[in-house]
Amino acid sequence: MERAMEQLNRLTRSLRRARTVELPDDNETAVYTLMPMVMADQHRSVSELLSNSKFDVNYAFGRVKRSLLHIAANCGSVECLVLLLKKGANPNYQDISGCTPLHLAARNGQKKCMSKLLEYSADVNICNNEGLTAIHWLAVNGRTELLHDLVQHVSNVDVEDAMGQTALHVACQNGHKTTVQCLLDSGADINRPNVSGATPLYFACSHGQRDTAQILLMRGAKYLPDKNGITPLDLCVQGGYGETCEVLIQYHPRLFQTIIQMTQNEDLRENMLRQVLEHLSQQSESQYLKILTSLAEVATTNGHKLLSLSSNYEAQMKSLLRIVRIFCHVFRIGPSSPSNGNDMGYNGNKTPRSQVFKVRKVYDVVRKIDVKEMNFTKHAFINQTSHEQEPLELLWHSLDEWLVLIATELMKNKRDSANITSILLKQKGPDHQDATPTPSFAAAGTESRKELSTDTGDSKTYEVAGKQEAYADCQDVISMTANRLSAVIQAFYMCCSCQMPQGMTSPRFIEFVCKHDDVLKCFVNRNPKIIFDHFHFLLECPELMSRFMHIIKAQPFKDRCEWFYEHLHSGQPDSDMVHRPVNENDILLVHRDSIFRSSCEVVSKANCAKLKQGIAVRFHGEEGMGQGVVREWFDILSSEIVNPDYALFTQSADGTTFQPNSNSSVNPDHLNYFRFAGQILGLALNHRQLVNIYFTRSFYKHILGIPVNYQDVASIDPEYAKNLQWILDNDISDLGLELTFSVETDVFGAMEEVPLKPGGASILVTQENKAEYVQLVTELRMTRAIQPQINAFLQGFHMFIPPSLIQLFDEYELELLLSGMPEIDVNDWLKNTEYTSGYERGDQVIQWFWDVVEELTQEERVLLLQFVTGSSRVPHGGFAHIMGGSGLQNFTIAAVPYTANLLPTSSTCINMLKLPEYPSKEILKDRLLVALHCGSYGYTMA
């Protein structure tokens, strides 16, 4: 009966308290009953359960083997913690990681729990398995108030963890100012190194903790490297921590020059150096000028080393350009930058920055250059005793002297080569003059010198030998100096450009290029890759482009494509992320049933800069995303742009290309749509997406800014083009045509007379002015009639593709960039080819020709097709459907008598290749490739 009553009472208490009132007998089960109560600090319930139980309060459970005292300390359950301590819980019991309850209380900032644990003799010096004590945990988390209480019980405030780090190390690394001050006040060793030799200052700088670094330096911390020689400044620069660098320089001024010298270290990231110097330059005008002056001096030193032929070209070139890039960056962000309207000329003196580079020194430099027994020596005297000289001006002066010297030698040897030729011809005698080619002095070498020097003893022979040797030496010097000088020229261009507002070219640099035009062209002709390595200004400056465009366009198409995309993306925030995924808010959401209009609307509202970096499209109601969807979007828009319903483009006479519609104004939104069409093609080119659309040659010329000519008229009116050709080919003086400089044009059914020039209706076309008439009427048909459409298209296109970059290509190459390389079926080509003027299918030359075509690359086959037909495409249906000037016209090969060095030519209006009767397959292939790559339309000799 008594037992039953006791069970009933336990049941009643349990139901009232909604918990058990008696712990299980085994510790494992009991501890999981108590743990949630301890976590909630339900000390009365815990006390009641423990009072009638044999539970071991030090029982360790779980994966990390912690006791309930660990749980209470970790959660801040101070009442339960005290209860457990009174019940005999061990305050120094360590879990599997070596942590005591005091460690956990310190880590989580449980102040009351820490106090009670200390009352019950918790050992503050116990380390966990990683060597961390309670004060380490307080320092990591910046719990200064608790640290004040704890350090009174600590015997060694510099106790180290497994890596030799003290509490001061970790407090400095995490930027806890008051904690650092507390530890220092408590006697922490301010210069104590860890196992790798890193001091607290080193730790502060490693994470850019400016304030803790300043406290340490104020308290006398030493500037010490670690065991690997890495200094606190190294860490600051590596992380781009400008503010911390500023503090280091404040206490150690010598470090300023160390930072400047770091600009030569290619192992340091350039953008981090820029960040540091940018911050330092913003502190004061004097600091800004000091940085620029120092950078200019280092750049000058590196530039002169680069001009020294004994230095390592690759290393010195990279160092110079790196320093100059950093210099220009700092220069631009100054308080009186060009964008703010201030004159930044090197030679000016209106702004403080005109004094940036000036240093008061007396220079007396004598430079002597003697290369491979050269017959000339350069003495450059720079005497400055009465005025200040800008450091960089010394480098530019040396550059100028080098270029003048080379120009002089080139001119001298050019005269000598003419004299040598004359002497050689006289020695050979009149019977040999016709058979003796002019010597190629670019290839003059040792053998030619030996031949000349071992002649009969004629004094003229030795004269020739000496001059040839001098010429060869000059060529050696150019070979050794061209790249070095080109790198310095690039540096000069960068410095000139940083003084100018965006988009403007420095007049000083233009003058420099004009002055040294011959030498620069010599460099480019000898090594065309210089254009892409150092002579970027040729493409970035419209004023200079025309002078070198023929050289630029002579470079391989592949090289120009690589340069194009490299510079197209170079101005973006992160050129490595051009094709990165875009933000959800930047996705172009379009409707399939109105894809043209909806795409036009969303693209016009989108951020152009973001579209350049990445593009994503989603069709309304569909989940698909990714490059496949983008590809489909461009494909569909390619067809929609030339959809007759929009009246934007009309099909040309060849049936495969399109031309802007001069009557597109029937669509009220036609100019908006033309701008959108330009945006789509610009976007496609930017992201290397091909479009399935082809335009007339004249339209590609409009995109490139190339003037059209009368031959372009054939794409829209072949018969009229033939008439223009006839006028040019024949004397019209006595024909009585009575043409004037005006034409009649059908404007929506009404005939209007349009003057080709002011007063054109009263100016007769004559034999003398007929060429002008043909050009003006061509411009009317091909340009003036569609000028608004062209302008709108280019406005959209240039949002994504700068005009200066696209001019790298001709109209044929632009088509390849936009629409890709067409596939050419050689068998179909052969089957639909005709032969004339003496050739037949079985002739040896014809067999060689087709063997060569089989050996050509796909790109070269396209060039051949363009060369003969004027088009890179095969029409739908194959070669049987190729159009000529008067309709269908098969590819035709005509025989031409062979003479030495004769190139193939073509007549594109009748798709005819005029192929000389070459004596061998090798000569045929060589001459054909020369013609294709040199574009010998109308040429007859190599």
UniProtKB/Swiss-Prot annotation:
Keywords: ANK repeat, Cell cycle, Cytoplasm, Endoplasmic reticulum, Golgi apparatus, Membrane, Repeat, Transferase, Ubl conjugation pathway
CDD domains, A to Z: HECTc
Coiled coil: none
GO molecular function: small GTPase binding; ubiquitin protein ligase activity; ubiquitin-protein transferase activity
ANK repeats: 23-55, 64-93, 97-126, 130-159, 163-192, 196-226, 228-253
Pfam families: Ank_2, Ank_5, HECT
EC number of the protein: 2.3.2.26
Free-text function comment from the UniProt entry: E3 ubiquitin-protein ligase involved in Golgi membrane fusion and regulation of small GTPases. Acts as a regulator of Golgi membrane dynamics during the cell cycle: recruited to Golgi membrane by Rab proteins and regulates postmitotic Golgi membrane fusion. Acts by mediating ubiquitination during mitotic Golgi disassembly, ubiquitination serving as a signal for Golgi reassembly later, after cell division.
Protein name, entry field: E3 ubiquitin-protein ligase HACE1
Gene source species: Gallus gallus
